[in-house]
Design a protein with these regions (language model features):
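Sec-dependent N-terminal signal peptides
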Residues: 5-13
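Cyclophilin-like peptidyl-prolyl cis-trans isomerases
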Residues: 16-231
């Protein structure tokens, strides 16, 4: 009897991200900045990254951190814990949480505009940072540019990739090298606004771009109805 009570107490003490997610719901991320708010979803195909991002979000880890590296027509990067109290001109990008996440590369998840992906250092396993991430802005590509990218990488793009990169845009040279684990479903204009900010020689915005990140489990039908996202 005591063991059952102890087990029940442990289960009740677990945070929301540690329990089995409800089948008919998804975790809706709200990322607010001084340039507006984005809503994002995390992919089930990358469970380790999804669980980790939910964990950090529930812990309020990202609140007050900066988008410390922004490059127009490429991406915006944030999640460095050292950025919370960084002074103007401080070099950022090396802060972490002391662990990496094994790569979860999926050919169906590529670097289209709005993709949420894990930053990483140069390691042969392509393991991801435990906390730093980037959101793709990229650019629109033509056939010639995509052929060049395929030749350089030695990989072929799917019809879906080619069509998406020619219309929505993205950063195809990152495919297969970094784990894409989510997507912006609302607020792409915010990505554009942040990406075009004046920056220093290290690509840090001259004016701080801070984030607040929260999330909640929402019925998938409601997400589809509110944001037009199809599962």
């Amino acid at each position: 009897m005591f063991n059952r009570i102890l087990l029940l107490a442990l289960l009740l003490s677990l945070p929301a991200w540690a329990t089995k997610p409800p089948k008919k719901k998804d975790y809706l991320v709200r990322l607010s900045t001084n340039f507006g708010t984005m809503h994002l979803l995390l992919f089930d195909q990358t469970p380790k990254h999804k669980e980790n991002f939910i964990k950090l979000t529930e812990q309020k880890f990202y609140d007050g951190l900066l988008f410390h590296r922004v490059i127009e027509k490429f991406m915006i990067q944030g999640g460095d814990p050292d950025s919370r109290k960084a002074k103007s001109g401080d070099r950022l990008g090396n802060g972490d949480v002391g662990y990496k996440i094994p790569a979860e590369l999926d050919a169906t998840l590529f670097h289209k505009k709005g993709s949420l992906a894990a930053a990483r250092d140069n390691n042969p396993e392509k393991a991801s940072s435990g906390c730093q991430f980037y959101i793709v802005q990229g650019r629109v590509w033509d056939d010639e540019g995509l052929k060049t990218q395929m030749a350089r990488s030695g990989r072929s793009f799917t019809e879906d990739q080619i069509s998406t990169y020619k219309t929505l845009g993205g950063s195809p040279h990152l495919d297969g090298n970094y784990t894409v684990f989510g997507t912006v479903i609302d607020g792409l204009a915010v990505v554009d606004s942040i990406a075009r900010q004046p920056r220093d020689e290290a690509n840090r915005p001259l004016n701080d771009v801070r984030m607040t990140v929260s999330g909640k489990w929402v019925k998938k039908k409601k997400i589809t109805r509110q944001f037009g996202y199809s599962y």
